[in-house]
């Protein structure tokens, strides 16, 4: 979740045996703040095993490269395409040039590169854009997402690019679901909504308790137009925030996270599987018990 991906939560997930992440969207374009938190994570855990996500053009290529190289990060995720927030795609040729310019030096470090997708990508584009795998969002996912189920996109992507590493993002909250995806060949399984409601997440206790009382049928689907493309967002809406905001609903999100009466938080169908606030250790133990 934008703003929910904090170094404190990442450390807790790592200590619980999970594979944590940090998202550049948390840092308001300040790459030095992301570097600071990454340094803190590595010092606190003694590990560089963390997944970093960036939106194309959000930072300079050099800034992204230096962050990844500083601790030889094993995996990164790039968010780009016709839904790119920071610069709508002018042409596929321009996009390819930009992606290769960013990713070629990073790939040379040995880092595996994932692309966030809402729709399937063919083998030609995967190879052309130097992609190793895909982080797959669908109708069950939190925040910006697609209309087709995660499982359907996952299975289609597996058939189209059998050598790709795949990470499903959305709707997972039980040990049986985790095992099913692992058995289907998932590299790992994301459980962002469940961890967003963990004891260690930055959401206020008031927000967590309010969310636990809800189910996925209570989620709202916002729509935004970015770069002439309409996108939807799955969110738990409190009283609507009426003030100025950006395309990602960041101010409303911060109010929702802090327990204000107006605002929202980005949650997915995984909310159906959260009935109480638990530690990351308890959550990960529960979700991996069938493996």
Predicted segments, located by residue:
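Active-site entrance/lid segments in N-terminal catalytic domains of soluble metabolic enzymes
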Residues: 1-165
């Amino acid at each position: 979740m934008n703003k929910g991906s904090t170094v404190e939560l990442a450390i807790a997930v790592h200590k619980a045996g999970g594979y944590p992440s940090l998202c550049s969207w948390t840092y308001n374009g300040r790459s030095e703040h992301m570097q600071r938190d990454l340094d803190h994570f590595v010092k606190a855990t003694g590990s560089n095993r963390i997944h970093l996500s960036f939106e194309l053009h959000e930072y300079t290529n050099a800034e992204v490269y230096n962050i990844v190289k500083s601790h030889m990060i094993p995996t990164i995720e790039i968010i780009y395409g016709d839904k790119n927030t920071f610069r709508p795609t002018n042409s596929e040729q321009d996009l390819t040039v930009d992606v290769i310019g960013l990713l070629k030096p990073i790939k040379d470090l040995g880092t595996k590169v994932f692309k966030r997708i809402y729709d399937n990508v063919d083998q030609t584009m995967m190879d052309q854009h130097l992609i190793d795998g895909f982080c797959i969002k669908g109708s069950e996912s939190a925040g910006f997402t697609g209309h087709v189920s995660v499982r359907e996109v996952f299975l289609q992507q597996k058939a189209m690019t059998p050598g790709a590493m795949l990470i499903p993002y959305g709707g997972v909250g039980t040990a049986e679901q985790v095992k099913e995806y692992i058995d289907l060949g998932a590299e790992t399984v994301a459980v962002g909504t469940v961890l967003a409601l963990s004891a260690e997440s930055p959401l206020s206790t008031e927000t967590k308790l309010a969310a636990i009382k809800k189910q996925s049928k209570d989620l709202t689907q916002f729509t935004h137009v970015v770069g002439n493309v309409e996108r939807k967002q799955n969110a738990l809406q409190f009283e609507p925030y009426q003030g100025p905001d950006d395309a990602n609903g960041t101010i409303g999100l911060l109010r929702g996270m802090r327990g204000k009466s107006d605002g929202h938080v980005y949650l997915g169908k995984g909310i159906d599987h959260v009935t109480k606030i638990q530690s990351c250790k308890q959550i990960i133990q529960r979700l991996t018990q069938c493996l």
